[in-house]
Curated annotation (Swiss-Prot):
Annotated protein name in UniProt: Proline--tRNA ligase
Keyword set, alphabetical order: Aminoacyl-tRNA synthetase, ATP-binding, Cytoplasm, Ligase, Nucleotide-binding, Protein biosynthesis
NCBIfam families to which the protein is assigned, alphabetical: PRK09194.1, proS_fam_II
SUPFAM superfamilies in alphabetical order: Class II aaRS ABD-related, Class II aaRS and biotin synthetases, YbaK/ProRS associated domain
HAMAP family membership: Pro_tRNA_synth_type1
């Protein structure tokens, strides 16, 4: 591609409304332009990157045995009503009516459509397993679109759906798709982790997320320092610590006026927060009168409640909701800052770490008072459970090493859906006995457009993007010095351009007549082109060309006759 005939829409200024580096650089490098909140135009350079990601995804899906289909973005409400999600999904589902007042939605996902398609096409267990995928635009009406294409309302996604006659068959395909996802992210060149995850609104049983590690990530990923274990913090098990061995001391009630927080209590009583417990009162399941009961959740003072773990408890309402202050006061006789586990007349769940304490500090269920030297023999009947988030340094649940936590950007998610949709929508085949058998489903998603932004979050410096070779808009930039005035420079540039193109490289020849050398060099850095060749008269007189790898700070001189072989090796090694 010649720069003189190509839209290079770079600019120097950092947009004021771009919060994360990927959004800033995608705008500055001329990859995207904002159309409206959460909606973006993809410019030529950006689309090149997007298509390369798409190609890698498509190749690995084909290799995994999935068949490509294409389903409509606009979906009839009837299918969503049939699955039960028309009302459940919430405002993220953009609902529309056509001219005949028939209800539709813009698809945020395609479980209903694929289930409807396959229930009409597959008739026998002999046709299973079957795996279908598409690369299609999705729309989710995010309440607050942000971070550019990272959390846009309209985005490009690869979603695949598999159909099976048995759980064992689903597991086989699930493992194949898991491996395919790893291959995709390996080929792109991302630092990622597959992690155990919650199924969320999609539903189902087993689930893994694929996270690109980046400081700007919105999710906390817990992983072992000595094994491959990794899980979303929400799902990582917090193992029970050894019980403290101190002898129980007599419990004392002490005045703690105007003290509401764990930190303030610990400071006033001169104890570490690790020797305190906090009691959270949440809404429980409804009683016979249709009113919410109350449930107490007790944690060590320095630990945070894990909502996902909490809602799995028998007495806790879903979604998790804290009880209002008036209800707490009426039930316990004290305000939030003075609550404790002793003397409660409601279900009490105590986290493992809190249960290991001896002689701890807790609220006395009396405004302005706490207990010191409290012990679990004093407390109401309770059940010991895991309801906290893991923290750095915790022993890993796998038994190897300790927990480290990093931020991650979710770029893929795979689910074992089971029969959630096939049962609701009566998607079945005839089994070997001629009887109806509900198909078991798997679901596999990758955020194609999100991968582009995620790759930037891992690969940039002060000068711009540093693309991995596999998805760079161009592999090589040829930058001439005074091409319009030097026949030798022009000839060598054209020669290199032809040779590299013939070898299958995407090449950008910076042949814009009025462009300055400094501006051209800055643009190639900003756009993240991995390999750059500068052609000038001085170098040619010495039989040399200046080469610079985008990842390196310094350039080097390469013999003219060796440059093609050098580029071949550089692209192969990524250096």
């Amino acid at each position: 591609m010649r720069a003189s005939k190509y839209l290079i829409a770079t600019y120097k200024e950092t947009p004021a409304d771009a919060e994360v580096i990927s959004h800033q650089l995608m705008l500055r490098a001329g990859l995207i332009r904002k159309l409206a909140s959460g909606l973006y135009n993809w410019l030529p350079a950006g689309l090149r990157v997007l298509r390369k990601v798409e190609t890698i995804v498509r190749e690995e899906m084909d290799r995994a045995g999935a068949q490509e289909v294409l389903m409509p973005v606009v979906q009839p409400a009837e299918l969503w009503e049939e699955s039960g999600r028309w009302q459940q999904y919430g405002p993220e589902l953009l609902r529309i009516n056509d001219r005949h007042d028939r209800a539709f939605c813009l698809g945020p996902t395609h479980e209903e459509v694929i289930t409807d398609l396959i229930r009409n096409e597959l008739k026998s267990y002999k046709q299973l397993p079957a795996n279908f995928y598409q690369i299609q635009t999705k729309f989710r009406d995010e309440v607050r679109p942000r971070f550019g294409v990272m959390r846009a309302r309209e985005f490009l996604m690869k979603d695949a759906y598999s159909f099976h006659a048995s759980q064992e068959c689903l597991q086989e395909t699930y493992d194949i798709m898991h491996a395919a996802y790893c291959k995709i992210f390996d080929r792109i060149g991302l630092d990622y982790r597959p992690v155990l995850a919650d199924t969320g609104s999609i539903g189902g049983t087993g689930s893994h997320e694929f996270h690109v590690l980046a400081d700007s990530g919105e999710d906390d990923i817990a992983f072992s320092t000595e094994s491959n274990f990794a899980a979303n913090v929400e799902l990582a098990e917090a193992l029970a610590p050894a019980k403290q061995t101190a002898e129980p001391l007599p419990r004392e009630e002490v005045a703690t006026p105007n003290v509401k927080t764990i930190e303030d209590v610990a400071k006033l009583l001169d104890v570490p927060t690790t020797q305190t417990v906090k009691t959270l009162i949440v809404k429980g399941v409804e009683n016979e009168d249709g009113k919410h009961t109350l449930v107490a959740l007790v944690l060590r003072g320095d630990h945070a409640l894990n909502d996902i773990k909490a809602i799995k408890l028998a007495h806790v309402a879903n979604p998790l909701e804290f009880a209002d202050e008036s209800g707490i006061k009426a039930a316990v006789g004290a305000e939030v800052g003075s609550l404790g586990p002793i003397g409660l007349s409601m279900p009490v769940y105590v986290d493992r770490a809190a249960a290991a304490l001896v002689n701890f500090v807790c609220g006395a269920n009396k405004d302005g008072y706490h207990y010191t030297n409290a012990n679990w023999s004093d407390a109401a009947e309770h059940k010991v459970v895991d309801i906290r988030n893991v923290v750095i340094g915790d022993p890993s649940p796998c038994g190897k090493g300790t927990i480290d936590i990093k931020r991650g950007i979710e770029v893929g998610h795979i689910f074992q859906l089971g029969t959630k949709y096939s049962e609701a929508m009566k998607a079945s085949v005839l089994d070997e006995n001629g009887k109806d058998k509900t198909m078991i489903m798997g679901c596999y998603g990758i955020g194609v457009s999100r991968i582009v932004a995620s790759a930037i979050e891992q690969n940039y410096d002060d000068n711009g993007i540093i693309w991995p070779d596999a998805i760079a808009p161009f592999h090589v930039a040829i930058v001439p010095i005074n091409m319009q005035k030097s026949e030798a420079v022009a000839q060598k540039c054209e020669e290199l351009y032809a040779q590299l193109n013939q070898l299958g490289y995407d090449v950008l020849l910076m042949d814009e007549p009025k462009a300055r050398l400094g501006g051209m060099l800055a643009d190639t850095e900003l756009m993240g082109i991995p390999h750059r060749i500068v052609v000038g008269d001085r170098g040619l007189e010495k039989g040399q060309l200046e080469y610079k790898c985008r990842r390196d700070s310094d350039s080097q001189d390469i013999a003219v006759d060796d440059i093609i072989e050098f580029i071949n090796n550089a692209v192969k090694t990524g250096k």
